[in-house]
């Protein structure tokens, strides 16, 4: 079960097997199809959950893709780095699909998907920006915290530059203020590779994602 989906009703789905019907929550059933979700703010709890799910799916089959659906406003930089790092660590490729929004740390995770397998739906919104230093306390502690925020921002700039093919100077300039992008703009920027169009007009990205093993899109 996706414990990160808080304060909501999680649907139950009946799956017919040779041993009879079995009830699953919807997220557990989709996990069997190698589909995982980032559907809330990025915090330690959701990061730990996604890391565990990705590692489990790698152990199940290191040759098959994992499909990570993203609808998140972002959140904690460290938690985002944890998800990003495990995506790069596992042997199987992680395809990323943005639905709704992928902002801040979630945009970094989106961009960190396997090359050629980073997607967004047509009305998705992506936003990149530098880290926030909102903190209180003794001046020296605030100075230490600010240095750490700047270091984390520099690392995020390096990651975005690596996955978009842009220079660190360009990325640093672009994130000085919140930069919102449409799916088309995110593709031009290099954060995603393709836009998944509606099913009635099946796109090459749709076919590629389906061929990669996502039965939900077939």
Tell where the protein language model's regions lie, with residue ranges.
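N-terminal organellar transit peptides
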Residues: 1-105, 111-218
